[in-house]
Amino acid sequence: MAERIVVSLTSADQEYQALQGENAREAGGRLGVEVEVLFAKDNGVLQIQQLFRFVHAGEGERPAALLVHTRVPDGLERVARNAVQAGIGWILLNRTAPYVDALRRECPAIAVAAVTTDHVEIGRIHARQLARLCPDGALVLYVQGPAGASAASLRLQGLEEALRGRPYELKVVNAEWTAASAEKAIAGWLRLRTSDLFQPTVVVCQNDLMARGARAALERLRPDWARLPFLGCDGLPKGGRLDVDEGRLAATITLPSCASPAIDLAVKWMRTGGVPPALTVLAPSAYPAR
């Protein structure tokens, strides 16, 4: 197999996904390996088709490794198993999946791993930011990612654990990591009669794009709520951090890119045979740091 790595991402419209693609290419250039980045237009079926195309390629045309960020990783177990059985490394980005350990046992010489942010810690950081903003408690409008995404559920888990026994009440609304989906989700919730029973004092969003979408819906339908403090996550320099600096967000959380460390692990395996650990966890950080 050639020294080539394919990075499969879900959507170029999601800021963090775009960052992963850029960082993967930069890491490939640094290490002297070919890196091909593909986006699946937020379409799970298309992503599976793209990945199978590489798995079923001729032996000399297959990549050495596939690095995959997917909306719901459990749905890719069959692709992962076929890839690993063909000798192709498989590394999940910013999430993990139950099948990783099983594939490592079945094919111990192949790189099967996950490089992910500590999503539970993201929830804990949001809890600390909430405590500084609203020390006496709050009604929290919480915009979560897709219900089936492990990253979304772990972030909520961390927040709920950190807030347990304290005077904070959550109203969870699910969206799809994008501004448009959050705007639609919040608008739909506001049209429900039950929304009148919950008067939020703060809005917490699992990424900065959804914070923008949620704010857009509130500005249009409940302009008095649009002035509430917002918390986000991802913290890109021209995204969430800029929103904090210019006052649109009260705070955000900066996430490291998983792509560059994953490229490092894949290249080490390709060149030395050293199998990476099953799980590499990267630490998020609050922005601003105080």
Outline where the language-model segments fall.
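Short beta-strand elements in bilobed, periplasmic/extracellular small-molecule ligand-binding domains
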Residues: 28-45, 139-142, 163-183, 227, ...
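Flexible loop/hinge segments that line or gate small-molecule binding clefts
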Residues: 79-121, 236-245
